[in-house]
Curated annotation (Swiss-Prot):
Organism, scientific name: Ethmostigmus rubripes
PTM annotation, UniProt: Contains 5 disulfide bonds.
Tissue: Expressed by the venom gland.
Similarity comment: Belongs to the scoloptoxin-17 family.
Subcellular locations according to the entry: Secreted
Record's protein name: U-scoloptoxin(17)-Er2a
Principal subcellular localization: secreted
GO molecular function list: toxin activity
Keywords: Disulfide bond, Secreted, Signal, Toxin
GO CC, alphabetical: extracellular region
Domain of life: Eukaryota
Signal peptide (residue range): 1-22
């Protein structure tokens, strides 16, 4: 369960980094990371309004606030159906391929987080080699220049 939170904290912290790359947002990317961050940032800021960059705990709290982390049978699971709905309107290109990748990686409504996210981001990288979000996810957290977008 701890690795669950670590993976998602890294995912969303890496997404925050993508804001600094906004000038290149359409350079091979498939997912508009700026739009994704704009959606999740209020939930994260509600948990930790003065923390920059937001800690893993703040990001985890934000995911719970957004309704993406749910508890089932005592285990915390990631709701990929809800994540798919949140991606609507935030995909720049290859929309069908992105949704197909999500379905291939998670065939149920709730899936274990770490293997599903690894699968999804590997598939996105294959389809969108210029997508910086997936490249950032492979970087060690300590090497990322994390910052929170201004509200």
């Amino acid at each position: 369960m701890k690795s669950f939170f670590v993976v998602f904290a890294i995912v969303f912290q890496a997404t925050l980094v993508a804001l600094s790359l906004a000038a290149d947002a359409d350079d091979g990317q498939c997912i508009n990371t700026t739009a994704v961050v704009e959606y999740f940032n209020p939930f994260i800021q509600e948990c930790c309004p003065n923390e920059e960059p937001p800690s893993r705990d703040c990001v985890t709290c934000g995911l719970k606030g957004a309704g993406l982390v749910v508890t089932e049978d005592g285990k915390e699971m990631f709701d990929f159906d809800k994540y798919r709905r949140k991606l609507r309107g935030r995909i720049i290109r290859n929309e069908r391929l992105i949704y197909r990748s999500l379905r291939e990686c998670c065939r149920r409504r709730l899936c274990e987080a770490e293997p599903t996210f690894t699968c999804f981001h590997d598939k996105v990288k294959e389809q969108c080699p210029g997508d910086r979000t997936t490249s950032l996810l492979r970087s060690p957290l300590k090497d990322l220049p994390l910052r929170s977008p201004s509200c």
